[in-house]
């Protein structure tokens, strides 16, 4: 989860908004029959609205199981087909400001219909503490 302490500048708020919307795009695609590269493309399209050059990462999520990071990878090269009951992460990220990076993560179970979140969804707006 992401939080700002005291205050958040406009760039941080915008980065958080883009990553929240990228996660929403991933949630909309995460259904049986979709591929990991479909997930990547959906999230990456939203990240590109922030800055077309940002988000050049190897992947935007992965499988979750006995290891912290497992197959499959949500990347343009992974054609793994999602199946019901797969447990995966959605992890869109982007660089912003002067060397800053923000990563948003939701862990989900792929289901017949909307995926099931394994924890409460992150707040819509960047939480500010203090």
Tell what function each PLM region has.
Residues 1-130:
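Active-site neighborhoods and metal-handling regions in enzymes and metal-associated proteins
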């Amino acid at each position: 989860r992401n939080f700002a302490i005291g205050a958040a500048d406009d760039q941080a708020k915008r980065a958080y908004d883009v990553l929240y919307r990228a996660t929403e795009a991933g949630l909309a695609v995460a259904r049986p029959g979709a591929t990991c590269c479909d997930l990547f493309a959906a999230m990456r399209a939203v990240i590109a609205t922030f800055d077309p050059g940002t988000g050049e990462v190897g992947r935007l999520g992965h499988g979750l199981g006995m290891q912290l990071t497992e197959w499959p990878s949500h990347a343009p090269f992974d054609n793994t087909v999602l199946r019901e009951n797969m447990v995966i992460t959605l992890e869109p990220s982007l660089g912003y400001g002067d060397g800053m990076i923000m990563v948003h993560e939701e862990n989900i179970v792929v289901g017949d219909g909307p995926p099931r979140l394994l924890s409460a969804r992150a707040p819509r707006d960047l939480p500010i503490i203090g």
